[in-house]
UniProtKB/Swiss-Prot annotation:
GO BP term (any one): L-arabinose catabolic process to xylulose 5-phosphate
Family recorded in the similarity comment: Belongs to the ribulokinase family.
Protein name: Ribulokinase
HAMAP family reported in the protein's UniProt record: Ribulokinase
Reactions mediated catalytically: D-ribulose + ATP = D-ribulose 5-phosphate + ADP + H(+); L-ribulose + ATP = L-ribulose 5-phosphate + ADP + H(+)
SUPFAM superfamilies, per database record: Actin-like ATPase domain (SSF53067)
UniProt superkingdom: Bacteria
Molecular function terms from GO: ATP binding; D-ribulokinase activity; ribulokinase activity
Length: 561
């Protein structure tokens, strides 16, 4: 009898369940449930209370809808029996967090509290805790806290402690009412099993936890505010388990809702980008996974913990048990290309695409591919949404150098592709300079599936082979793979993620190999990129920040330094 697991990938706008064949990793069925409430960034449901700028909330009931609708649907589509499903795995955006009561229910489920914004789920892109993040960084730097170096020198406004402190500052009564603060991935797992456990991925990358040292000392949290002194032993308490461990079994009530068997194994929760690493076939050091979409998340495994300039985090057992998982990233990649499509393409080129019956991006790719490296005469800094790694500075902005009256849209397009590749090379260089090996690249996500020119440019700029994941749903596949490990080999799953990856993870037959002539030409361009990178990014010329300040003053707002 065939065995299957279900991976459930919770995104920003919807959740997707994928049923996976354990024998070969085939994605047999999938179903998407859009979130009924979407991203709540204007006003609260029901009460209509307006939200301040930079807020981004969600309704936890939407997450339950994904379970209730999508899980039974994939079983129905595949026409299999419940007994053939031996495990469930979850991945989620992060840090997406919520306050819960002593029964494990979200505080926003209480009608008395639903009209207060801090009772709701704070989505990963909730940026209203910037003041708290700034103070965390200032105090941590003053105290020389060890955790700060593991985050590339800066703790983000998107992460757990920043968001908790915002709740404490703006609604102290809500802070007191919260029995605990959970990552949404851990809350969904708790709904399935009836037991709350935390995962080492989000605890490490988002909540200051370290496998050997634990959380920072209580004195650090007391330095933030005396009321936070016991935070980690009270509202962040709980067992922290590694990816692939069994969080528990499906409760009888939830089994009935999902149409599965009670006791079905449920894996510890995970994060969407990180869980994609084994799904791309990477379970050993020396290989960098690029999760490529609107932005890029760069993930690397290593045997040792090292400080890498501008990394977003390094966590032991954070991605694959037994290794340190490193994370870095670029704040905008696909979003930059989308910006050009929206604002930088002349009407005649759009008309040409229509007449040829081609998508606009396909025509641009075709035209841009005709140029050799350096032939456009242009160079760009890929900072349209700031710089995440390695400079960790959200107030940097984009730059294009070399315009002439003859510059064409396809030349701009190619230049922006190249700029993002140079940004990735900067990250690779930072890892190598710190002693972390990167010898081959693996790509997954939306971009590698539809832009071959981009992939070839990345191979040429980095002088590395790029292998592309066969799956279009790597997060869900990775969650399903970890579900197979949680179920174990006796149930028909796998003993380790290494064994699961050998059978379930695949790359496409075609890889992208560096063109040696292009490598030589791009090295010269990269040297010029590096000059611009350091000149504008390391403080020699702060014109980008000055322009943002002037723009803000003109609009009557403020900019965080």
């Amino acid at each position: 009898m065939k065995r299957y697991t279900i991976g459930i990938d919770y995104g920003t706008e919807s959740g997707r369940a994928v049923l996976v064949d354990l024998e070969n990793g085939a994605e047999v069925a999938e179903h998407v449930t859009p979130y009924a409430h979407g991203v709540i960034d204007q006003c609260l449901p029901d009460s209509g209370r307006s939200l301040e700028p930079e807020w981004a909330l969600q309704h936890p009931g939407d997450y339950l809808d994904v379970l209730r609708l999508s899980v039974p649907k994939v079983v129905e589509i595949a026409d299999i029996s419940a007994s053939q499903v031996i495990g469930i795995g979850i991945d989620f955006t992060a840090c997406t967090m919520l306050p819960i009561d002593k029964h494990g229910d979200p505080l926003c489920f209480d009608p008395q509290l639903a009209g207060r914004p801090h009772s709701w789920v704070k989505l990963w892109k909730h940026h209203a805790a910037q003041d708290e993040a700034d103070e965390i960084n200032r105090i941590a730097e003053e105290r020389k806290e060890a955790f700060l170096a593991r985050y590339g020198g800066k703790y983000s406004s998107e992460w757990m402690v920043s968001k908790i402190w915002q709740i404490f500052n703006e609604d102290p009564d809500m802070f007191e009412k919260a029995d605990a603060f959970l990552e949404a991935t851990d809350w969904v797992v708790a709904q399935l099993t009836g037991t709350i456990v935390r995962n080492s991925c989000t605890a490490g990358y988002k909540a200051m936890w370290h496998k050997r040292d634990g959380y920072p000392d209580d004195s650090f949290f007391a330095a933030l505010d005396p009321g936070l002194a016991q935070l980690t032993t009270t509202k962040l308490r709980g067992d922290i388990l590694a990816p692939g461990q069994r969080a528990g079994g499906l409760t009888a009530e939830m089994a009935e809702t999902l149409g599965l068997k009670p006791g079905t194994a449920v894996a510890v929760g995970n994060v969407d980008a990180h869980v994609a690493v084994p799904a791309a076939g990477v379970v050993t050091p020396g290989k960098m996974v690029m999760v490529m979409g609107t932005s890029i998340c760069h993930l690397v495994l290593a045997k040792e913990e090292r400080e890498v300039e501008g990394m977003c985090g390094v966590v032991e057992d954070g991605i694959v048990p037994g290794y340190f998982g490193y994370e870095a990233g670029q704040s905008a990649v696909g979003d930059i290309f989308a910006w050009l499509m929206k604002h930088g393409i002349p009407a005649d080129l759009k008309q040409e695409a229509e007449q040829a019956g081609k998508p606009l991006h396909s025509l641009l790719e075709e035209k841009a591919a005709a140029y050799r490296p350096g032939e456009t005469g242009l160079l760009a800094l890929d900072w349209w949404n700031g710089n995440r790694s390695t400079l960790v500075d959200a107030n940097l902005t984009g730059l294009i150098l070399g315009y002439t009256l003859q510059t064409k849209a396809e030349e701009l397009y190619r230049t922006l592709l190249e700029a993002t590749a140079f940004g990735t090379k900067k990250i690779i260089d930072a890892f190598r300079d710190s002693g972390v090996e990167v010898n081959v690249l693996y790509a997954c996500g939306g971009l590698p599936q539809k832009n071959e020119l981009l992939m070839q440019i990345y191979a040429d700029v980095t002088n590395l082979e790029i292998k592309v994941a066969a799956s279009k749903q790597t997060p869900a596949l990775g969650a399903a793979m970890y579900a197979s490990v949680a179920a174990g080999d006796e149930a028909g799953g796998y003993e380790t993620i290494f064994a699961a990856a050998e059978k379930m993870a695949h790359t496409k037959a075609r890889s992208f190999k560096p063109n040696h002539e292009n490598v030589r030409l791009y090295q010269a361009l990269y040297e010029e990129y590096s000059k611009l990178h350091d000149y504008f990014g390391r403080g020699e010329n702060d014109v980008m920040k000055t322009l943002k300040q002037l723009r803000s003053r003109a609009k009557g707002g403020a900019v965080h330094a």
